[in-house]
Every structure is written in C-alpha cells, then in structure tokens.
Amino acid sequence: MLDPRLFRTQLEETARQLGRRGFVLDTAAFGALEERRKALQVETQNLQNERNSRSRSIGQAKARGEDIEPLLAAVQGLGERLKENEAELASIQERMEALLLGVPNLLDTDVPEGRSEADNVEIRRWGEPPQFDFEPKDHVDLAVGLGCADFEAAAKLSGSRFVVLTGPLARLQRALTQFMLDIHTGEHGYIETYVPFLVNADSLRGTGQLPKFEEDLFKVQHEPVFYLIPTAEVPVTNLVRDEIVEEERLPLKYVCHTPCFRSEAGSYGRDVRGLIRQHQFEKVELVQIVRPEDSREAHEALTRHAEVILERLGLPYRRVLLCAGDTGFSSAKTYDLEVWLPGQQSYREISSCSNFRDFQARRLQARWRNPETGKPELVHTLNGSGLAVGRTLVAVLENCQDEAGRIRVPEVLVPYMGGVNLIGPAA
C-alpha cells in the first residue's frame, strides 16, 4: 500500500507516476473523499471545542443556581453530532483504504517505459545456447519418452495441468531442490524456513495478492477461510507482520521450499502443455527484510543469488529488467531471469526478483527500530525465486538431452543423484 499522505498532498503527481504503468488513478474519487475528510475534521474539532466550552458553562451556571437543563440538552446534542461525524470519518477512512488496496506500487525511476514484455530491457546474458546436430525435443516428449512423466494419470487424479513424476525424474526434481537449498543456506547466508501451505486472507492482503488477484488463488471452502499459497513469499514475508524488528537482526534472509498453487485463470497457448504452467508446482523462494537504505543493493544481491544456481547447472540465461507496464502490482522494480529452452527456441522466465520497498511493509505493519531515532519505521521487503523447481527441471531436460533422448545430469547434481550421471535406457 502506498503512503496515504501522497493522496492528500501530491495527488496529481502520484497519478502521473502511476500512469507509467498504464494505471488510471481515480483522482476524482480520492479528491472528493479527501475534501470531505478535511471538512469533517474541521467541523468535528469545532464541535469538540463548543462542547468543551458548554460543559464548562454548566458548572458555572450550576454554581450560580441557574437552570442547567437547556445547557445539558445542548451538550447532548453536540455529542450526538460528534458521534455522527466520527462514524462518517470512519466510513471515509474505510472507503479510502479500499481504494488504496487497489492501487499498485510506484516504480523506481530507472524502470524503463513500456507497456508489455516486448518493451523489457535485456541487461546481460550468460552462457551460449547448446548447438545440437539433431532436432532437439521439448521437455514433454523427453519426459514421456523416458517413462517418467504421466500426464494422463495426473488428469485422472486431479484434472489438467498436473503431472505425476516417477523414478529418476522425481529424484532429479528432489536433487534440484536440495542443491538450491544447500547453496542458498551454505553460501548465500539464508535461513531455511518451513511454513504452512494454507494461509488466511490477512496474509494475502499483506503481500498484495488480495483483494485484486483473488481469481488466481485456490480458496478452501472451510471455516475459517484458508487459501493455498501461490508462492512462499506470502507466509515467509508475513513472518514480520505486526512486528518491530530490532536493527541488529537486519537483514533477515529466508529461503523456503514449498509447493505453490495457482488457478492460472486466463492463461492459454503453448504453456498449457507440459510443466511450464501448472496448477501445482514447486519453488525455492528467497525473501529478504532489510533497512530502507539497503534495499537497492539487496535487490542486486538477491538476483545474483538466483543467477548462481543457473550458472552452476550450466544453463544459459539472460537477465531482463521489466518495463513499467510489465512490472507486478506490488513491485517497485523487477528483474526476470529467463533460461534458454531449446524445445521452444526461446528464453523463458525461471525467476522473478523484486524490490517492493515499503509497499508490502505498510500493509503488514512490518517495522524496524531505527537506533538513530529510537522510533519504529517501515522495513523494505524483497523476494525472488531461487529457482522455480519445475521450470529448472524443464531447462535441464531440454539443454542436457542427447539424440537418443537421454539426459546428462549436471555435474553438481550427481552427488544428489547417488552417482547417476545419465538418465535414459542405456544409463
């Protein structure tokens, strides 16, 4: 959530900045609410002053032996008007907060202009796409050919956009997860965290998924209401909700492996087939809670931590800075890491690393105690995938295939595979 003061003192400038995203701020609605709020506050203050004055008069009139009933009636009437004003002020505040929940974050100044992913800016590339002397298969043909992926069985169990992995591919997915966790905890200084996969609505409001993106969530029909997590970002970031973190504890760096659940409402096309876009998938998520002055540097570091995984696996990728129109609702700045997929002959997103500045923290009331002032101030929050496990599995299958449809296991994963370095019939 943006600072409400922006809508009181810098409404037009805030609207202009939000316009970079293609978001049209309803300045008339905000302006009307603000004008009414200010008028009510002035009126309420005047009523309070008048009530206080008349209350003093009651004591003086009583001391003089005068009839105080008219004064008591007047004070009672003022009290009723004050209650009405206070109720209207509370209503205005609720309406203002409801509007604010639908307003995205302001973008950093170095986020490029643009409306769609076509306007994103490539920052750099690492590695060269493999050159095959045969027509490379996509991950679906490879996985099914190995007899280790069963989409029909998954459809029988759950429906479309699910998969059953067995044998060496199930183990390869586990190996990828363990490898990522080991690097992030052992080399990058993250604390491994296990969290609930069901969360309440307050948690999703805190990180920005609610109310705007409810259709993307799986809601459990139960009392109390729960939602399946769309990403570990939600429960992990909410660990600091309503907390004041002491300065010496910062930065907080968490890594968390969870399944993720998304309805993928409205998605279609090539990603409906295979493992790229499923209702249930796994991620290793990186979350950082930092001092405001450290968030820009932390964003670069977190993105680099995700890149290290790709490089250790030998997977070609590129870093892309998202343009204004493609940056997510809660983010001030986002880098996407896109891995090369030979089966699609294109780079596809495998990690999204974002700096939210104080946008989530204001919703969460997540604060730190500034030692210079002794007062609580909002933290900055960041997160990114380190990496999406299923998409990393896809990238390994497609980049490490041979003509026979076998898969060469990346060297760093061989110990996690019990020494197996080749997956396939002749392995």
Curated annotation (Swiss-Prot):
Record keywords, A-Z: Aminoacyl-tRNA synthetase, ATP-binding, Cytoplasm, Ligase, Nucleotide-binding, Protein biosynthesis
EC number(s) stated in the UniProt entry for this protein: 6.1.1.11
GO cellular component: cytoplasm
BP GO terms, sorted: selenocysteine biosynthetic process; seryl-tRNA aminoacylation
Binding site for L-serine: T231, A232, E233, E285, S385
Primary location recorded for the protein, binned into one broad class: cytoplasm
InterPro entries tied to this protein: aa-tRNA-synt_IIb, aa-tRNA-synth_II, aa-tRNA-synth_II/BPL/LPL, Ser-tRNA-ligase_type_1, Ser-tRNA-synth_1_N, SerRS_1_N_sf, SerRS_core, tRNA-bd_arm
Cysteines joined through disulfide linkages: none
Role played: Catalyzes the attachment of serine to tRNA(Ser). Is also able to aminoacylate tRNA(Sec) with serine, to form the misacylated tRNA L-seryl-tRNA(Sec), which will be further converted into selenocysteinyl-tRNA(Sec).
This protein's domain notes: Consists of two distinct domains, a catalytic core and a N-terminal extension that is involved in tRNA binding.
HAMAP family (alphabetical): Ser_tRNA_synth_type1
Assembly mode: Homodimer. The tRNA molecule binds across the dimer.
Record-stated family: Belongs to the class-II aminoacyl-tRNA synthetase family. Type-1 seryl-tRNA synthetase subfamily.
Record's protein name: Serine--tRNA ligase
Species per Swiss-Prot/TrEMBL record: Methylococcus capsulatus (strain ATCC 33009 / NCIMB 11132 / Bath)
Taxonomic placement: Bacteria, Pseudomonadati, Pseudomonadota, Gammaproteobacteria, Methylococcales
